[in-house]
């Protein structure tokens, strides 16, 4: 791996991780579909490259996982049959935009979609990743 090239590429992407407590568990599939579509539309309208956007909307009986790995057409939503004591939303995103703008977009879309059921932001972190510094590294290409 050329770590200089890798670091240059990674530095273009804002990273975001957020968790939200959801107050009422209702219309989860509708909410997840809207959240996924809205994020895809926003990123496409700003012509932003999406590395990935993932979210889990977890209810007491089932969860919904949304993914975008490029343009909005790549968006997928699937159900999980796992139960939870808590009702929450977890968002993980890597998008070619400054982290502050990524936070702004995600916060606006969370508010737009989840305000009808109520939510509370628990954690929200965004950053530009630092240069990788692997513990073990080959000095030359290893041929297998």
Give the location of each predicted region:
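P-loop NTP-binding site
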Residues: 2-144
């Amino acid at each position: 791996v050329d770590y200089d090239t890798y670091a240059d590429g990674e530095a273009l992407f804002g990273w975001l991780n957020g968790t939200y407590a959801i107050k009422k568990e209702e219309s989860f599939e509708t909410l997840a579909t809207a959240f996924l579509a809205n994020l895809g539309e926003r990123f496409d309208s700003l012509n932003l490259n999406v590395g990935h956007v993932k979210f889990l909307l977890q209810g007491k009986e089932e969860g919904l996982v949304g993914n975008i790995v490029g343009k909005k057409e790549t968006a997928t939503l699937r159900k999980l049959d796992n139960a939870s004591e808590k009702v929450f939303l977890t968002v993980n995103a890597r998008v070619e935009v400054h982290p502050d703008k990524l936070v702004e977009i995600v916060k606006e879309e969370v508010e737009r979609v989840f305000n009808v059921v109520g939510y509370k932001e628990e954690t929200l972190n965004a950053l530009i990743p630092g240069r990788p510094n692997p513990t073990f590294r080959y000095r030359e290409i290893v041929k297998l």
